């Protein structure tokens, strides 16, 4: 059904479509400029010019590699939740909280009714899409994850916070669709953190995507999915983007016990390691997927965003994805 939906949207993709989860490493010149901007040494207009330059580089790079569905690389974003919290009325900035390793972010605080100020991602999607004839994914963070990664000082409970955010994210989805976006990824990395709250995440996603004309992807990672599977299949999306290689394909055994009914963006390279996989290792991962999953439901991509790798590493890991996909098509 999902491939039929893509065709209805005017998208003709090959078997084993290749894509990326969202983020790419920022070039050194942009890293320096972002730091200088915070210090007041770089004007906003100049920073935006450099962000556009870096975005164009990654669109061109993906095209040269032969990636099928592109991403803008998020050159203009830092943290995936803070980006939205900084732009949505109702949030204030909290103190620094460790995200993972030695990476920190200012944990947002919901202090008033959240609202939609107008599009906060559409201009960047339009810029990226204008650079290519291939489809570019719209990239959003889901309502449940924004709620879970924020403090709440306004709403009576976590569900009402998530649903208020779902109403806001839906407006952004509608704006992307109105601009011509046909594939929209709504990231929910917090999906498996509190298994007892899966119904909240499902309800929030249902509100976000219901009756809207797009192909929806969600990316979830870092979790123990056995606690929420197969219930998570009720999430109102067409495609789950899952971190498979970093978990040694453990999820495949869960799928063996209960069929996976969605399309899957199957992570075949580990984004947390500087080590480069061999072509043979990547092929074996795809072969393992094919023992359980139908070939017309498998997309191929990295495990997660590539922003923590070097530019060179990110390119090579993407190249491995594309080479694997092409080898299985033939």
Where are these regions (language model features)?
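Domain-level signal for soluble alpha/beta catalytic cores
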Residues: 1-330
């Amino acid at each position: 059904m999902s491939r039929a939906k893509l065709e209805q949207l005017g998208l003709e993709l090959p078997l084993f479509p290749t894509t990326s989860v969202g983020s790419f490493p920022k070039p050194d010149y942009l890293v320096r400029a972002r730091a200088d901007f915070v210090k007041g040494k770089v004007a906003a207009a100049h920073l935006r010019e450099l962000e556009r330059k870096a975005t164009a580089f990654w669109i061109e790079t993906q095209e040269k590699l032969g990636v099928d569905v592109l991403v803008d690389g998020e050159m203009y974003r830092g943290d995936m939740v803070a980006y939205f919290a900084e732009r949505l009325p109702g949030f204030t900035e909290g103190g620094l909280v460790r995200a993972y390793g030695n990476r920190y972010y200012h944990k947002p605080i919901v202090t008033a009714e959240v609202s939609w100020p107008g599009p906060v991602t559409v201009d960047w999607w339009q810029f990226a899409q204008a650079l290519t004839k291939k489809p570019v994914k719209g990239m959003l963070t889901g309502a449940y994850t924004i709620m879970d990664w924020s403090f709440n000082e306004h709403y009576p409970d976590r569900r009402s916070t998530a649903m208020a955010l779902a109403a806001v994210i839906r407006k952004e989805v509608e704006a992307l669709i109105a601009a011509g976006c046909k594939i929209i990824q709504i990231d929910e990395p917090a999906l498996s953190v509190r298994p007892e709250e899966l119904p909240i995440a499902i309800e929030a996603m249902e509100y976000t995507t219901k009756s809207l004309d797009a192909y929806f992807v969600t990316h979830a990672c870092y979790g123990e999915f056995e606690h929420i599977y197969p219930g998570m299949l009720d999430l109102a999306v067409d495609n789950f983007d899952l971190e498979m290689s970093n978990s040694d394909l453990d999820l495949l055994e869960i799928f063996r016990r209960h069929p996976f009914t969605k399309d899957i963006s199957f992570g075949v390279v580990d984004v947390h390691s500087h080590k480069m996989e061999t072509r043979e290792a990547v092929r074996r991962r795809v072969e393992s997927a094919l023992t359980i999953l139908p070939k017309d439901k498998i997309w191929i991509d990295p495990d997660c965003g590539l922003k923590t790798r070097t530019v060179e590493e990110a390119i090579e890991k993407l190249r491995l994805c594309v080479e694997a996909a092409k080898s299985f098509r033939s």
